[in-house]
Amino acid sequence: MAAAAFVPIPTDTYKLGFIGAGKMAESIARGVVKSGVLPASRIRTAHLGSARRDAFESFGVKVLDRNDQVVEDSDVIIFSVKPQIVKEVVLQLRPLLSEKQLLVSIVAGVKLKELEDWAGHSRFIRVMPNTPAAVGEAASVMSLGATATGEDGELITKLFGAIGKIWKADEKLFDAVTGLSGSGPAYIFLAIEALADGGVAAGLPRELALGLASQTVLGAASMVARGGKHPGQLKDDVASAGGTTIAGIHELEKGGFRGTLMNAVVSATKRSQEIFKR
């Protein structure tokens, strides 16, 4: 793969294009606009369906008819299509792609090496966001391709920082990322449902129980993320001797709560490895 002269992305004027106009692309675009990282006038995508066109146009994004139009009018291009069609899509657009453009993939399970081979160059960054992107609370992880620069990484950090938090990691860790943050929201949804059911069993009205459960999880997560204390210390702080909390924790420990969560992450990681093994 021949190296091209490096051209920095013009951070003050660059245009962002989405190949694929689904819910995740919409969440990213909305977050970027809402946070002020980019004005909607510098974002574009393509779709022929009225519902998806309306969704993007409702906050000012330019919606074109064809993917090639998006590529020709963008400096940073995010591929957000389904894994089973990404190869075909990238190969179709390959004649229009150049190393003057920064390419980004949020497609699950498709490795950088494959993306680089299909695109014909390696100025690529792979990002794995998760579904809380829809409410601006994504946990995303990125890995840089062979010729993506530190400046490219900073640009993507700023973009995806608009929908939550983003970390940098080696791509070989992405199956484990899938097992933890990719599948993790479903584990937490299950935990919230179980907490609410427990509240109902203890006599609370369903609506109150669900509200208390979801807000408790949100508050506890915020204490871990922002407070600087280890979760074990936070647990100890609230579990007083002979009290209600330690009695509840005792039941969780008898049920193998920690081990079950750990096993869920490991099992999902292994399944990711099986599904996306090539």
Curated annotation (Swiss-Prot):
UniProt keyword annotations, A-Z: Amino-acid biosynthesis, Cytoplasm, NADP, Oxidoreductase, Proline biosynthesis
Record Gene3D superfamilies: NAD(P)-binding Rossmann-like Domain, ProC C-terminal domain-like
Class of this enzyme: oxidoreductase
Catalytic activity of the protein: L-proline + NADP(+) = (S)-1-pyrroline-5-carboxylate + NADPH + 2 H(+); L-proline + NAD(+) = (S)-1-pyrroline-5-carboxylate + NADH + 2 H(+)
Location, primary (coarse class): cytoplasm
Domain of life: Eukaryota
Pathway in which the depicted protein is active: Amino-acid biosynthesis; L-proline biosynthesis; L-proline from L-glutamate 5-semialdehyde: step 1/1
MF (Gene Ontology): pyrroline-5-carboxylate reductase activity
Alphabetical GO biological process terms: L-proline biosynthetic process
Compartments, record wording: Cytoplasm
Its EC number(s): 1.5.1.2
Gene Ontology CC terms, in alphabetical order: cytoplasm
Record Pfam families: F420_oxidored, P5CR_dimer
InterPro entries hit by this protein: 6-PGluconate_DH-like_C_sf, NAD(P)-bd_dom_sf, P5C_Rdtase_cat_N, P5CR-like_CS, P5CR_dimer, Pyrroline-COOH_reductase
Keyword DNA damage: no
PANTHER family: PYRROLINE-5-CARBOXYLATE REDUCTASE (PTHR11645), PYRROLINE-5-CARBOXYLATE REDUCTASE 3 (PTHR11645:SF0)
Family note: Belongs to the pyrroline-5-carboxylate reductase family.
Protein name per its UniProtKB record: Pyrroline-5-carboxylate reductase
